[in-house]
Amino acid sequence: MKYLIVYASAGAGHRKAAEAIHEALLERVDKKDVAIIDSLDYTNAFFRWIYARKYITFVNDLPNIWGFFYYLLNIRLIYRLIRFPRRVVNVLNCRRFEDFVLKNRPDVVISTHFMANEIVAHLKRNNKINCRLYSAVTDYRMHFFWVTLGVDCYFVAAEQTRKDLIGCGISKDKIFVTGIPISPKFSVSLNKQDVKSKFGLDASLFTALIIGGGFGVGPVEELVKKIGALKIDLQLLVVCGYNE
């Protein structure tokens, strides 16, 4: 059985979830039967730029505008109006991704991004490929963009995500609450004092971890300053990904 794991590099979360699934699968099946790809590598340059770069720009610099369109397009009536043109745009810009899937003909496609759901489901509806399509939803709250006819199973973060999907019209029998995929490395127990020593931390101080995702999205610097101004003894570890 051949497995294809697909993500889109619009932020780092979709990629990390896909990599976690990849790591877990490699513990169970032969390496030659598992492939992992970034679907945006199989699109045209302009589409990739919009998806991967402008997304981060909007979230960081124009969060109110981003939020407005996010919630607007999550209204059932509005989404129904844009569903077909959205599908056309995805299909037209993802021809090379379609070709990759048809050439490799996986038995199972596991997607951590809704764009891949749309493309693979389109191939299934047109009887171009016969495979299982599993969607690992990387958001805690559901958006209509994740809802695609042709997805066989949804693996979701929490019970609330499951309820959201059911509210979107998905059968409860297709939804499994598994949590967001994380690397098997996080299941390994480590000695806290050894880790603090490795990073040059004071073993006697309370330690807080601030995570801004793979691209340092959000007011991370402001948050650090405000916590640093508190009259308490603590030390901070800050993960800001590629944001230098």
Where in this protein do the model-derived segments appear?
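Conserved N-terminal ligand/cofactor-binding loop architecture of enzyme catalytic domains
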Residues: 20-100
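Proline-aspartate-enriched helix->loop->beta-strand connector
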Residues: 101, 105-107
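A short, glycine/small-residue-rich beta-strand->loop->alpha-helix junction that serves as a flexible
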Residues: 7-19, 218
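Extreme N-terminal starter segment of soluble prokaryotic enzymes
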Residues: 1-4
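Short His-centered aromatic/hydrophobic patch
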Residues: 112-115
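Active-site-proximal region of nucleotide-activated glycan assembly enzymes
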Residues: 126-188
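Donor-nucleotide binding loops and adjacent catalytic segments primarily
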Residues: 192-193, 201-244
